[in-house]
């Protein structure tokens, strides 16, 4: 059934950089399948804007982490959400697509759905890991879920939520065999000798909590592994400025800080010390041994621990269904423990070969041409809506 060609409008919201990446991928697929006159608007980042998206609010207004840290931003977030809902109900786009950011988007999606506007959510929340009660909220809010991981549709189906497995765009973008030598040349690193990539996060709260520990761990590793070099990507000038006091406090470190280029930095590495998050999946797709770590404020950690279901938090372990790389979280994330675990990952060649096999299988499973599959699923929802009109 052909879609209308007159001013098709889709509203979208992405709340953080990883969502911006996913939404931009989806927008690219939609632009190939929908009329050229179609308009896309809402809240998004620079990658979405590059795809012709009209962002009415700055995406970083929605970027928060944890329960405690969010308190100071609640009034501004609620104001933006209220304005967005009023705009949606007044303009009635063909659909609303929330990309990740479930705490913000589910409320908007429910308002859209209640008003007869199809609601689509891209990225299933980790209901299989923690906060399983969210599935009731999903059932009330979401007409169709776009899932990044293959085990999610079966969980949603039990709750009566329509969904499509679309794979992960990172698996499409990252080559099956990373070019470590080329990455080292690009960063001006020696072709030989051990390199460890260190990624302590991109938020001020993350750097404050785990940055000093990561730098202390690097200092220990340099003592124990002469000749080791470190590479650390800084996504923005503000992040580089935030890291500078830690760099100044450890002048002995053989450390290269790159302007962005986190994927190149990880590709150049023999092992990675990384904070928990989507970046751990990227490290797995690059076939890198790693140590996953994270620290959150005590209260946030207690809430997450009480609501957790799985014994692991890192995506490589979740997707494998077992511990394939070590996780050192909260008070277990000491400089000594991080240094020991990371050096083990660096030196253990048998483990490296095993991880390459595990991560290659994972990569092939997630490589689904996500932009095309997600866009096709959205088009089907639009066609179904037109058929009922």
From Swiss-Prot:
Pathway: Bacterial outer membrane biogenesis; LPS lipid A biosynthesis. GO terms for cellular component: membrane. It comes from the Bacteria. Signal peptide: none annotated. Its EC number is 2.4.1.182. Belongs to the LpxB family. Condensation of UDP-2,3-diacylglucosamine and 2,3-diacylglucosamine-1-phosphate to form lipid A disaccharide, a precursor of lipid A, a phosphorylated glycolipid that anchors the lipopolysaccharide to the outer membrane of the cell. This is Lipid-A-disaccharide synthase.
């Amino acid at each position: 059934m052909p879609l209308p060609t007159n001013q098709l409008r889709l509203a979208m919201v992405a709340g953080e950089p990883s969502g911006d990446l996913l939404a931009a991928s989806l927008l690219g697929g939609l632009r190939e399948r929908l009329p050229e006159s179609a308009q896309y608007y809402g809240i998004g980042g620079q990658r979405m804007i590059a795809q012709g998206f009209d962002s009415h609010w700055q995406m970083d207004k929605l970027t928060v982490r944890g329960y405690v840290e969010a308190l100071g931003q609640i009034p501004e977030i609620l104001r933006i959400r209220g304005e967005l809902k009023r705009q949606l109900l007044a303009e009635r786009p063909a659909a609303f697509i929330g990309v990740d950011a479930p705490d913000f988007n589910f409320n908007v999606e429910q308002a859209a759905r209640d008003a007869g506007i199809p609601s689509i959510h891209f990225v299933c929340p980790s209901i299989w890991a923690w906060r399983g009660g969210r599935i009731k909220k999903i059932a009330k809010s979401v007409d169709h879920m776009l899932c990044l991981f293959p085990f999610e549709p079966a969980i949603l189906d039990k709750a009566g939520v329509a969904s499509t497995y679309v794979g992960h765009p990172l698996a499409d973008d990252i080559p099956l065999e990373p070019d470590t030598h080329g990455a080292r040349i690009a960063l001006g690193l020696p072709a030989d000798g051990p390199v460890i990539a260190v990624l302590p996060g991109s938020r001020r709260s993350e750097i404050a909590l785990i940055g000093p520990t990561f730098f202390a761990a690097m200092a220990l590793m340099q003592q124990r592994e002469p000749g080791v070099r470190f590479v650390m990507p800084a996504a923005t000038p503000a992040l580089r400025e935030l890291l500078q006091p830690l760099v100044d406090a450890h002048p002995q470190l053989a450390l290269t800080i790159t302007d962005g280029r986190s994927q190149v930095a990880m590709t150049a590495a023999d092992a990675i010390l990384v904070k928990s998050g989507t970046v751990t999946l990227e490290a797995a797709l690059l076939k890198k041994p790693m140590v996953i770590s994270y620290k959150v404020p005590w209260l946030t950690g207690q809430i997450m621990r009480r609501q957790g279901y799985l014994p692991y938090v890192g995506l490589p372990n979740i997707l494998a269904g077992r511990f394939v790389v070590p996780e050192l979280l909260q008070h277990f994330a000491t400089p000594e423990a991080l240094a020991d675990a990371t050096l083990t990952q660096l030196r253990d060649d048998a483990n490296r070969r095993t991880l390459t096999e595990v991560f290659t299988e994972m990569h092939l499973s997630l490589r689904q041409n996500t932009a095309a599959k997600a866009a096709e699923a959205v088009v089907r929802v639009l066609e179904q809506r037109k058929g009922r009109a």
